[in-house]
Amino acid sequence: MSTTPLVSTAPLLSAEELKVAFPGRRGAATARAVDGVDLDIRPGEIVALVGESGCGKTTLARSLLGLVPPTSGRVTFGGAPLDYTGRALKAYRKRVQLVLQDPSGSLNPRHTVYDAVAEGLRIHGYAGDERAAVSDALSRAGLRPPERFFLRFPHELSGGQRQRVVIAGALVLEPELIVADEPVASLDASVRGEILALLLRLRDELGLSALVVTHDLGLAWNIADRVAVMYLGRIVETGPVEQLLTAPQHPYTRALLSVLPEAEGEPVVLAGEPPDPSKVPSGCRFHVRCQVLASGEAERAGVAEACRTVDLPVLNGGGDAQVACHWAAACGGPVEAATS
């Protein structure tokens, strides 16, 4: 679990009422992939965006990166609205870098390590000492001495080394924020801890911020300052990592935690699959799979009808513990943003 204090309380990156929708084929309903999200990331902060496959977290990350323009809402960086066109977007992408989950797919097999890391410098017209910048980035990523790796090709490296090359390619541009999409999912268990430790060290040494997209709450515990749990296009619970993972309020968060190896009690088996984002249920979007509603607990708390029919407002993007859940509100959970 990350414990480094934040450098600043002013957000570096903010999403406000962000929505991303994709039109359906042949007149089908629009898919609401991101359906109203507020999210702040502060300088030096690591935020884990957690949820099942298909919940919208990768689409949200791509929109924050400037790769997918929002349907509505806005993204700001350093207080300025993100311009999704032209030179402004190119300059933004230098400051915000992406690290993908599959290093083999991220690296051109015909390019040497040196060329892979130097590519960003060349795209952005770097006028300094290219060799020195590449060497420094490889060293920071844990590939030392860097000169030993210059002429190697991706197939000559281990999985962990390839991921370090990808990270070096992001670091070489001296970004302020890294978006890491499942950064250790394709790696052996023995290597995952090394890459997570590297990301934490880079935050401590460089003041980097990071958004880590993952389905694994265990990973979030090891690396994040704050967690945002996403379900069907919305963040349904957010807060400091220790508070959220030791005292989760939302039934969905509880279900995700219940399947971790160290969890006590029986795992929660959710009914069915996540609904189609083109057919978002009325009321709480989780209610059709909710174990609390199915067990009768919501009925006993007097909120079952609200669960089925009353939508919940978007949680604000700040760092306080918040949950969008009628049942949690009835039980006294931290839901001020969900009742405004």
Sequence positions of predicted segments:
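Short catalytic/signature loops enriched in Gly
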Residues: R25, T30, T238-S340
